[in-house]
Design a protein with these regions (language model features):
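DNA-recognition helix of helix-turn-helix
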Residues: 155, 164, 169-170, 174-201
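Sigma70-family region 2
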Residues: 61, 72-89, 109
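C-terminal edge and immediately downstream basic/flexible tail or linker adjoining helix-turn-helix-like DNA-binding
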Residues: 2-9, 143, 174-177, 191-211
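Arg/Lys-rich amphipathic alpha helix in sigma70-family domain 2
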Residues: 83-85, 99-117
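Internal acidic/polar
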Residues: 19-20, 26, 112-137, 141
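Amphipathic, Lys/Arg- and hydrophobic-enriched alpha-helical face
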Residues: 45-63, 80, 148, 197-201
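Structural recognition of an alpha-helix C-terminal capping motif at a helix-to-coil junction
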Residues: 54, 68-75, 88-100
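N-terminal module of bacterial RNA polymerase sigma factors
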Residues: 1-50, 58, 211
Length: 211
């Protein structure tokens, strides 16, 4: 996609390479030009759509849900970009949007599951359907996802922000709206909980394979 465009400032025409601009400059252009000109918005989408999808995928575990929520989150950026005031980085603001959409979807999934279980008293998640043929990277990914799913929601969020999104502890503090020291403590507790969950998953899997 071409990201260069001639922008008129008063009476002067300036050629702008949008792909080289910072997030903050792109946001400024969006606030000035949307909905008439989508160039700056499209650059922001291309810059973050991969990370947004990966985060949604880790939160939700379903590709269909992740694609839908990622699309909804980026559309919300289009709708709400004029409300961005620069008190945090654009990335932090975006991840707050993603976090809220993922939480809402998870709540809907849980409610739906509870309704189903009220009619199917024997309904349980079948975790034995996965066949482990070899200890390859896909197997390790399954272990990681299962361990993540065993964490408390707040612990899972922090682990995903740190390792999937590459956020700093300061950015995590801003997204979760807690102090920097509290974010650091919560991160280390979450990391310890993840390590314990991962060890249990791998031990249980190995024990099952040896039967």
């Amino acid at each position: 996609m071409g990201t260069e465009e001639v922008v008129r400032t008063n009476t002067v025409a300036v050629k702008v390479d949008f792909a080289s601009l910072s997030d903050e400059d792109l946001v400024t252009y969006c606030q000035q030009q949307l909905p008439d000109d989508l160039t700056a918005y499209k650059v922001l989408v291309e810059r973050y759509e991969g990370m947004v999808f990966n985060l949604c995928m880790k939160f939700l575990g379903s590709r269909q849900d992740a694609e839908e929520i990622a699309q909804d989150s980026l559309l919300q950026v289009f709708r709400k970009i004029n409300q961005f005031q620069g008190r945090s980085s654009f990335k932090t603001w975006l991840y707050k949007i993603v976090q809220n959409y993922c939480r809402n979807r998870i709540s809907k999934i849980i409610r739906k599951r509870e309704v189903q279980e009220s009619y199917e008293d024997h309904a349980k998640e079948d975790v034995s359907t996965t066949t482990f043929d070899s200890a390859d990277s896909s197997e390790k990914s399954e272990y990681i996802q299962e361990a993540l799913n065993k964490l408390k929601p707040n612990d899972k969020e922090i682990i995903l922000y740190k390792f999937v999104s590459g956020m700093t502890l300061q950015e995590i503090a801003e997204v979760t709206e807690i102090g920097a020291s509290a974010a650091k403590m919560r991160y280390y507790r979450a990391l310890e909980a993840f390590k314990e969950a991962y060890e249990r998953v791998t031990k249980n899997t190995q024990a099952t394979k040896n039967i």
